[in-house]
Swiss-Prot record:
Any single Gene Ontology cellular-component annotation: cytosol
Pfam families the record matches: BRCT, DNA_ligase_aden, DNA_ligase_OB, DNA_ligase_ZBD, HHH_2, HHH_5
Entry binding sites for NAD(+): 29-33, 78-79, 107, 130, 164, 278, 302
Gene name of the encoded protein: ligA
Organism taxonomic ancestry: Bacteria, Bacillati, Bacillota, Bacilli, Lactobacillales
Protein name: DNA ligase
Top EC group: ligase
Length: 652
């Protein structure tokens, strides 16, 4: 029986590979089902012989308790966006300045969810979401339910690969039809449906919804030299690889490819929202390196957003957590990019004045970044006698006088006791990307605030079961869950807490960069603006905002209250030594190194506090030049930049 189970497992896995990866079925569905049923029967009778890569282990379902956080060994960076031919030409110019003979590979930008798959000796170990690029969620059990993801590779490799999980238009249509029949809310678009599916706790639901994938990157070190070779290897290993791509050195040919794909976009079985252009040489990619947010060797051209006409019925003014007052237009409903849109942002008062937007106007509405509905401009030919919009002088929440600073485009309420400002700050603190206090959403925050139970974020940690029980609609079980979520948030990473404080210009990535240097939020109470500005990726604006916040007496009180409540203040990641020899310096490696390989040299520089970049500019502080150094060395000399060799680096 053991031998037969092995035969069936190997045979069925080969059939799955032919069907899902090669798109060339080598057996009829009925024959496959017959063999599959035989394997199921044998495995039920002899469970001790069930193999790790059995296809039966990738179907069925279990109920998961939740998803654990997963720190990516290789960070997932965002891509720089481009919306015009001019931006692509500028990218081409930057690359060709370093590598005149560079070629590009243009690939489809799948409108799905980024995933990372890690294999050990050929077997799938971890499937994870992108998250913030450094920390995602471990969704391995759900990943196993996606039929075109191989549980075992065709070779016993230890490798980490990247790609997109998506839902086909056909599957999306079928799911929404079923949800409509069951009286359930329909998904807005395939991307939302795929996102909701990957976060399902019931893995059988994932299996039924028939997600699919396209893989496009080997994140771990590879023996391949070119990106097109990587795609070929991924296909050989058993992954699904998108068949549409263009290899060329000409931006004219790239543009022709983009226009060809855009024209057939609606004919594809899945949604795409652009084309990604990558430098094809992996060695050149390594030389070009990364900015804080994105690789310098790739750019994502985004297709123009769909636009529709709608009438502005009224305008609401709302106060955000930093006091910014944002205008939102209420519209006649329109279908836009798969969703019904009845509200759209007007951005700020300067935008309203610039576009001369008035209530009653017919306007062009689009989705900024394919996500946020926004008003593009007014259809002047349809304007009648609309009056100029009245801009509020007083805060719609607290009645305080609004200010419009010269260097800002927004109206701002500067009353620290403004109810809306406080509520938005509390909501932000409890949000998923900040302290992730499950259940503590806007409705409950509002009830707590109006009841007088919370006035700042530290008050959240003083709440009792009796406090929650006094709120309308909160029962004992809900109160217990909320208290448990609050307690659990105390052990969150310190960067989540710093982000949760809602300091202007301090996002989640900036929070991590700051704490890599300072190590503890308490240390920020005495941090100097000039020190913060030296941190790679920050600058004077962020430094000023951070120091202004922590110089307030209320900040010291808040930090003390949070610490007393047991909230984690300490950064658990690897701390950067601000006393390191090269701290704050921007360094470029060029030429051939004799003793160290490039990764070893980069690791050493970063350990010494340096930021390693791929190109020489006026911002470069130091160039480490090996043998056969070319244009980068010459440019460094022309700019008067300090130059050292490999021996100097090794002695540090």
């Amino acid at each position: 029986m053991k031998k037969r189970i092995k035969e069936l497992t190997d045979l069925l896995n080969r059939y799955r590979y032919d069907y899902y990866t090669k798109d060339a079925p080598s057996v009829s569905d009925s024959d496959y089902d017959k063999l599959y049923r035989e394997l199921v029967t044998l495995e039920q009778s002899y469970p001790e012989y069930v193999l790790q890569d059995s296809p039966t282990q990738q179907v069925g379902g279990t109920i998961l308790k939740g998803f654990e956080k997963y720190r990516h060994q290789y960070p997932l960076f965002s891509l720089q966006d481009a919306f015009s031919r001019e931006e692509l030409d500028a990218f081409d110019k930057r690359v060709k300045a370093e590598f005149p003979n560079a070629t590009y590979l243009a690939e489809l930008k799948i409108d799905g969810l980024s995933i990372s798959l890690s294999y050990e000796n050929g077997f799938l170990q971890v499937g994870a979401t992108r998250g913030d690029g450094n920390i995602g969620e471990n969704i391995t059990e759900n990943i196993k339910k996606i039929k075109d993801i191989p549980y075992q590779l065709s070779e016993p490799l230890t490798i980490t690969v990247r790609g997109e999980a998506y839902m086909s238009r056909q599957s999306f249509k079928a799911i929404n039809e079923a949800r409509q029949e069951n009286g359930e809310t329909e998904f807005a678009n395939p991307r939302n449906a795929a996102a909701g599916t990957l976060r399902q706790l019931d893995t059988s639901v994932v299996a039924k919804r028939q997600l699919a994938t396209f893989l496009y990157q080997e994140a771990s070190p590879t023996a391949r030299n070119q990106q097109n070779e990587v795609l070929a290897e991924l296909a050989d290993l058993g992954f699904s690889v998108n068949p549409y791509y263009q290899l060329t050195s000409s931006m004219d040919e790239i543009w022709d490819f983009i226009k060809t794909i855009e024209a057939k976009r609606d004919q594809l079985a899945y949604d795409i929202d652009g084309v990604v252009i990558k430098v094809n040489s992996l060695a050149m990619q390594e030389e070009l390196g990364f900015t804080v947010k994105a690789p310098r060797w790739a750019i994502a051209y985004k297709f123009p957003a769909e636009e529709k006409e709608a009438e502005i019925l009224s305008v609401d003014w709302t106060v955000g957590r930093t006091g910014v007052v944002t205008p939102t237009a209420n519209l006649t409903p329109v279908q836009l990019a798969g969703t019904t849109v009845s509200r759209a942002t007007l951005h700020n008062v300067d935008y309203i004045a610039e576009k001369d937007i008035r209530i009653g106007d017919t306007v062009i509405v689009y989705k900024a970044g394919d996500i946020i509905p926004a008003v593009l401009n007014v259809v002047m030919s349809k304007r009648n006698q609309q009056e100029v919009m009245l801009i509020p002088k007083l805060c719609p929440s607290c009645g305080s006088e609004l200010v419009h600073f010269e260097d800002e485009v927004a109206l701002r309420c500067i009353n620290p006791l403004c109810p809306s400002l406080i509520q938005r700050s509390l909501e932000h603190f409890a949000s998923r990307d900040a302290m992730n206090i499950t259940g503590l959403g806007p409705a409950i925050v509002e009830k707590l605030f109006l009841a007088g139970f919370v006035h700042d974020v530290a008050d959240i940690y003083q709440l009792t079961k009796e406090d929650f029980m006094q709120l309308d609609g909160i029962k004992e079980k809900s109160a217990d869950k909320l208290l448990a979520a609050i307690e659990a948030s105390k052990s969150n990473s310190a960067e989540k807490l710093l982000f949760g404080l809602g300091i202007r210009h301090i996002g989640s990535k900036v929070s991590r960069l700051i704490l890599e240097v300072y190590g503890d939020i308490s240390a920020l109470l005495t941090a100097k603006e000039e020190e913060i500005a030296r941190i790679d990726g920050l600058g004077s604006t962020i430094a000023q905002s951070l120091t202004q916040y922590f110089e307030q007496k209320t900040a010291a009180i808040l930090v003390d209250e949070l610490k007393t409540a047991g909230v984690n203040m300490h950064y658990s990641g690897q701390k950067v030594n601000s006393d390191a020899a090269l701290f704050g310096l921007t360094v470029v490696l060029t030429g051939k190194l004799n003793q160290l390989n490039r990764n070893e040299a980069k690791d050493k520089l970063e350990a010494l506090g340096a930021k390693v970049t791929g190109s020489v500019s006026k911002k470069t502080d130091l160039v480490i030049a090996g043998s056969d150094a070319g244009s980068k060395l010459e440019k460094a000399k022309s700019l008067g930049i300090r130059i050292e060799d490999e021996d100097w680096l090794r002695q540090l």
